[in-house]
Structure formats: structure tokens, C-alpha cells
Regions:
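Non-catalytic interaction-recognition regions
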Residues: 1-184
């Protein structure tokens, strides 16, 4: 319907749109059923994820030294990132069980684990610059085996993105990123 509407409005690219449907998203307690009142409102779920991220981050000391404003921003980024990653890491044609508690973990195949690894990498780079290391001259660098493996995995990124686009599967990119951060 949307394709036809866009075409009639003069947007010729509307014909190229592809409907991207997902499998069912269930909760650990079972299927969501509107008649039984077990449907989760998206806004409530997002609020729950942000609050869970705040609690877990506090428990782990990841908000130490942050202002209330910074803690709120971090909690929102981590909580919503956890939700988005959990949905993206599963092939869209498969059903999934969304477990809010598992998705907020800072270990394993989760958004917070990937975000935390990214923050660690940024910290290492920032400290290297502060120590006077150049981030442009690599002529004297002799990478070790682990670094070579990481570079080779990074080189796979364009092919992974192309395959994800060809197969309409963002899960390929999500899982590639997880495999990449495990190397770090």
C-alpha cells in the first residue's frame, strides 16, 4: 500500500521499497496476548530498559563520578542500545524471546557489552594521544598476531554490510560487531 501511495504522489523510488517483517517477539513468560493483558507497551519497555541500565550501571560502578545529567544520558544510551541490539542480533525471519534482564548485561552478546568495549577503546586512544603517540604514522608499528587478526576481521566489514543488505538481515552486522569486540 505504501509503495502505491508513494508512487501516486510522484515518488518513483516507492516501487523499490521492500516490506521488512519480523518474527514474533515473545517474553520469557510466554507469548504476548492482548486478550490476557500480556502485551508490553513499547514506551513502557523503553522506560524499563533505561531504568534497568541505570541500576546495573550503578551496581557495577560505571556511573561513579558522573553528574546526574551524565548518568541519565548514559542510562538512556545503554538501555535503548540494549533493546535495539537484542532485536537486531536475531535474524528478522525468526521468532525471538526478549529477556530484558539478559539484554542489559555488560557481558556476552549484548548491546551494553559492545558499548562498553567501544568506550574502553576510545579511552585507550584518548590516553595514547595524551601520552604523545601519533595516530597517523604507523610506519614503525609491527602488529602482533592478535592485532593482525583484528585488522583482518575489520577488513571483512564491507562484505558483511553488502551481504546484510542483499539478504535484508541486519543480524549479520550485529553479530559481526559482537565477534569483532570479542577479539579486542
Amino acid at each position: 500500500v505504501l509503495s502505491l501511495l508513494l508512487d501516486r504522489l510522484g515518488f518513483k523510488w516507492g516501487k523499490d521499497l521492500v516490506h521488512f517483517s519480523y518474527g514474533m517477539v515473545e517474553l520469557p513468560e510466554g507469548k504476548m496476548k492482548s486478550r490476557e493483558g500480556t502485551v508490553v507497551d513499547a514506551d513502557d519497555l523503553m522506560d524499563e530498559m533505561v531504568n534497568s541500565a541505570r541500576e546495573v550501571s550503578k551496581e557495577l560502578g560505571k556511573l561513579d563520578g558522573c553528574t546526574a545529567e551524565e548518568a541519565n544520558a548514559i542510562s538512556e544510551i545503554v538501555g535503548l542500545g540494549a533493546l535495539k541490539y537484542f532485536l537486531l542480533k536475531v535474524d528478522p525471519r525468526k521468532n525471538m524471546t526478549f529477556n530484558p534482564k539478559e539484554s542489559i548485561d555488560f557481558n556476552g552478546n549484548t548491546g551494553p557489552f559492545i558499548q562498553y568495549t567501544y568506550a574502553r577503546i576510545r579511552s585507550v586512544l584518548r590516553k595514547a594521544v595524551e601520552a604523545g603517540y601519533s595516530m597517523t604514522d604507523y610506519s614503525k608499528v609491527e602488529p602482533n598476531e592478535k592485532e593482525i587478526s583484528l585488522i583482518q576481521r575489520l577488513a571483512d566489514f564491507p562484505a558483511v554490510v553488502a551481504e546484510a543488505g542483499r539478504t535484508y538481515s541486519p543480524a549479520l552486522i550485529a553479530n559481526y560487531v559482537y565477534d569483532l569486540v570479542k577479539e579486542y
